[in-house]
Amino acid sequence: MRKKPLTIFSDGTLTRRENTLYFESAKGRKPLAIEGIYDIYIYGHVNITSQALHYIAQKGILIHFFNHYGYYDGTFYPRETLLSGDLIIRQAEHYLNKEKRLFLAKSFVTGGTKNMERNLKNWGIKAKLSDYLDELNDARKITEIMNVEARIRQEYYAKWDENLPEEFKIVKRTRRPPKNEMNALISFLNSRLYATIITEIYNTQLAPTISYLHEPSERRFSLSLDLSEIFKPIIADRVANRLVKKGSLKKEHFREDLNGVLLTEEGMKIVTKAYNEELQKSVKHPKIGSNVTRQRLIRLEAYKLIKHLVGVEEYKPLVAWF
């Protein structure tokens, strides 16, 4: 049985009866095949009994919580079973050493830039985002790298806008709250991708709170933010572009709230379905020689980072060939 993500939009309670997980809601009690659950995404008001939580933890399943507006709140992160003290020391060493940290931070931005450029090419838009890479390579501080990355992304959104339907223009990237429909869609997808990457990191020996481009924080899994630089263009942005170009999302799938614009529940369901389908799309990997899914590419990227940290092979970010 291939494991799949479980997404809950309804209000209710997750319970356990013997060796079965149930979701109880106003619609009744529904059994959930826990062996088929990869991770859980909760958008509704959901209570979880301690028995259910223990069972979910035993199975090594992460639960990602999002608030009513679709913003990421946090993750239930079961006790890690793949911990490596040596790797954690190597991760910390690469953060504390300025040159090693700069190398990784620049690598994440380089990968993201080339993937954004690939998107624009696929969409028939001319742009030379890689012209910024010389300036990126000259950066000597993390803040300088972040500034270059911000300008690259600003130009990327401006170019992307040229190819978007009139009612779905980005205009300017806005967050918390997004000021228009396209910003709401991008924010929702980025939050979902952030959580997906957390799940993939959990299934490796990496510590999720030690990062290089983004400052480590007590309140976030910042390594997921680093890796998301590479995957936002080739997963989240491609889903967003396809949904609005094909007319799968319409104005009616958004609502005004919090002085901004947010997806309706129906809109979130449409986006989630498209996102999950995107994760399962496969492509032949040039190095491995076999087909791998988009989701597997995230795990492989984490493994590449591990090889770099332990000195086996220098890290090179994923640059999309598809």
Swiss-Prot record:
InterPro entries tied to this protein: CRISPR-assoc_Cas1 (IPR002729), CRISPR-assoc_Cas1_C (IPR042206), CRISPR-assoc_Cas1_HMARI/TNEAP (IPR019858), CRISPR-assoc_Cas1_N (IPR042211)
Keywords: Antiviral defense, DNA-binding, Endonuclease, Hydrolase, Magnesium, Manganese, Metal-binding, Nuclease
CDD domains: Cas1_I-B
Keyword Cell membrane: no
GO biological process per UniProt: defense response to virus; maintenance of CRISPR repeat elements
Cofactor section: Mg(2+); Mn(2+)
Entry's Gene Ontology molecular function annotations: DNA binding; DNA endonuclease activity; metal ion binding
Domain of life: Archaea
Class of this enzyme: hydrolase
Binding positions for Mn(2+) per the UniProt entry: 149, 214, 229
Enzyme Commission number(s): 3.1.-.-
Family: Belongs to the CRISPR-associated endonuclease Cas1 family.
NCBIfam families: cas1 (TIGR00287), cas1_HMARI (TIGR03641)
Role, per record: CRISPR (clustered regularly interspaced short palindromic repeat), is an adaptive immune system that provides protection against mobile genetic elements (viruses, transposable elements and conjugative plasmids). CRISPR clusters contain spacers, sequences complementary to antecedent mobile elements, and target invading nucleic acids. CRISPR clusters are transcribed and processed into CRISPR RNA (crRNA). Acts as a dsDNA endonuclease. Involved in the integration of spacer DNA into the CRISPR cassette.
PANTHER family, per the entry: CRISPR-ASSOCIATED ENDONUCLEASE CAS1 (PTHR43219:SF2)
Subunit structure: Homodimer, forms a heterotetramer with a Cas2 homodimer.
Protein name: CRISPR-associated endonuclease Cas1
Lineage, top ranks: Archaea, Methanobacteriati, Methanobacteriota, Thermococci, Thermococcales
Gene designation: cas1
